[in-house]
């Protein structure tokens, strides 16, 4: 299984046997993307100056095609992720989120591809940052953080020599850490001074980073990451883009175990598209600990809310 790139398995029990853990793209496409990004970044770390743009182009086109054909894209990115492979998995996830959001914004297929390529390569500059800083489990010093902040410009400068990478993809690499209030880097741009592609990538980058395990902290639940994005709209993130983004997110991914305001324990069975906080649940235990096996659609029971995510 490991040789096939399968590092994690989902275990089914009597409560989850018929629950589908949906992904926005095929597992095979995700594994291919991760493998290509890994090989690409490792070559740069080892001093090679060429980039295998053909493989990158093929996988970004595949991701774009799959997302364009998927009528009801719900982003369920909080599947099992590896801390050691964070940079590579994060690159694929950011590409997926960028393309999905770009689709909601009505971008052409060509624009989606360029945005997706930018998302795939947004952290390429980190290959030129010392790994002891990138993977430091403790808080970075001010000096170390200044070094980290060089990665957008390092990545942009590296890609400037590769003509097959679109200028629009490069601008994602250069500007994905800019923030609408001017507090970002490397140039401190504000609002519409930041290209819309980069404003899209900023949301994708932060959302996936928050919902991933890191060497210095555990992942956040999806709903908490979504709340962070909402709470920092117009300060860090573009309000209009956030409005398009949040309905695409599975706040409580399929298979999540939750506690309800009624005291019941439940498992998320499926999603109500467009209503990320109101999934369909399977009740498994009442407030007195008695076992249940009953469906509850939160969209039809607005007086009940999810109060806690167990797993």
Each model region followed by its residue ranges:
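Transcription initiation cofactors for RNA polymerase, centered on bacterial
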Residues: 2-44, 51, 56-59, 67
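Histidine- and acidic-residue-rich, metal-dependent catalytic cores
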Residues: 35-311
């Amino acid at each position: 299984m490991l040789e096939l790139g399968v590092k994690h398995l989902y275990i089914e029990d009597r409560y989850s046997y018929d629950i589908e853990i949906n992904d926005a793209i095929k597992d095979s496409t995700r594994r291919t993307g991760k493998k290509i990004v890994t090989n690409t970044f490792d070559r740069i770390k080892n001093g090679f100056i060429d980039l295998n743009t053909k493989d990158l182009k093929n996988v970004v086109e595949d991701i774009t095609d799959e997302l364009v054909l998927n009528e009801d894209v719900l982003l369920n990115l909080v599947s099992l992720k590896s801390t050691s492979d964070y940079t590579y998995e994060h690159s694929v996830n950011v590409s997926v989120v960028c393309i999905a959001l770009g689709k909601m914004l009505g971008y052409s297929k060509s624009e989606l591809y360029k945005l997706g390529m930018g998302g795939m390569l947004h952290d390429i500059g980190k290959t030129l940052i010392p790994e002891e800083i990138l993977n430091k489990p403790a808080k970075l010093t001010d000096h170390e953080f200044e070094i980290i902040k060089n990665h957008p410009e390092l990545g942009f400068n590296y890609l400037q020599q590769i003509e097959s990478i679109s200028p629009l993809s490069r601008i994602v690499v250069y500007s994905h850490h800019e923030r609408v209030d001017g507090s970002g880097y490397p140039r401190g741009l504000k609002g519409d001074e930041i290209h819309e592609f980069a404003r899209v990538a900023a949301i994708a980058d932060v959302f996936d980073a928050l919902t991933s395990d890191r060497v210095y902290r555990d992942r956040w639940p999806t709903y908490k990451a979504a709340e962070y994005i909402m709470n920092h709209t117009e300060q860090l993130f573009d309000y209009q883009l956030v409005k398009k983004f949040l309905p695409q997110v599975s706040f409580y991914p399929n298979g999540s175990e939750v506690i309800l305001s009624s005291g019941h324990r439940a498992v998320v069975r499926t999603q109500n598209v467009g209503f990320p906080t109101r999934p369909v649940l399977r009740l498994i235990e009442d407030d007195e600990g008695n076992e249940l096996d009953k469906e509850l659609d939160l969209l039809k029971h607005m007086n009940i809310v999810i109060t806690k995510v167990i797993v």
